């Protein structure tokens, strides 16, 4: 059928080239369709007798390239091929989920400074033909999500990160803005991906560090960005985009405002974000335990039962396969929770109470000998600060909590946190609270960056070019890059 339609379409193009659609036919195309006499054709030629829905289906089968070319045939074809629904259909056939495309183009197309509304119904109508055309020529980008524990990197056009590495083992603390360390880290990524830095833009996921609203913390954040941009432009990268990790995790959940709870490698951060901006002035709460502490605590529990293992990586794998968060810790202790998993090269491991006791230190840190605030208390404190802040807009913006980080993928965490918050907070704050699990698992921030990299206005709205960087550095000094 598709081959036959292409032959028919070829004849339409040939007629157009031969002048088969005179100017008077254009006016006919715009008027209501009338029955055609035998042998009489309108502006669509022999296809004029077909219903509109059949013609639309023909354009769908022909594909976006031929649909775009059809606009040059005559006014009737131009009207058909410009239909928003047709180009929405083509976008749905693309690699990115449709709802993510709509969210990105609606809320992120203007760049990091402008986010028009939180929900689709308050957004301007998109021209999907324009969006499709622009997205088709957006260059592929390198995405680097380098946290203090682990790094993910890959191409923006790929479905998932193509490489991972243990940042803390290979490169040390990359959150410290040292030129040599960052250059070594980024050079290694480019080498492993076998690409030249000068050939494509890069998106760097900024780590959650120096999050206080103090003068020294602001200076540290500026210094980190300064150093990062200097390293990349010295490597001749054509364009750079850098976005906070928590903001990207929020974007991955199709939100521009909310609270992100990131269980990082060494610490857990509770980050309030309003319209794509981290609200440092409200306060980023930090709990001094993260994924490493959970893994270390499971290691202690396994050693107490004389369970042998080769390395901390083994314990981490067991944690990811067997551990979960209990809805009710005391009730869970009365259940039979024994389960087993296999670790490649080391055989089978069986856990019981350790499965839920490991993650319980998020809510009861004293169980693991940690003097810290429970996760639910830290989040409730952040929500209380948001409630009392002078932020104009949606009064409920902080009631959406998005989890991120590898350990936030533990089953039961979102349900337990939501339950604890409802019990801890007063009704006027807790009403409407929703805790969302990591939308893309351990890679949520990476996928948030991927969403930005494919938006139709990416290079203009989100990137800074080398020439801009050099000019503004000379004019304003090195700290100007905090505006990107």
From Swiss-Prot:
Coiled-coil residue windows: none
Pfam assignment, any one: Actin
GO MF terms held by the record: ATP binding
Keywords: ATP-binding, Cytoplasm, Nucleotide-binding, Nucleus
Classification via SUPFAM superfamilies: Actin-like ATPase domain (SSF53067), F-box domain (SSF81383)
Domain F-box: 44-90
UniProt-annotated location(s): Nucleus, Nucleolus; Cytoplasm
Superkingdom in the source lineage: Eukaryota
Residues where ATP binds: 262-265
GO cellular component: actin cytoskeleton; cytoplasm; nucleolus
Family: Belongs to the actin family. Plant ARP8 subfamily.
The protein's name in its UniProt record: Actin-related protein 8
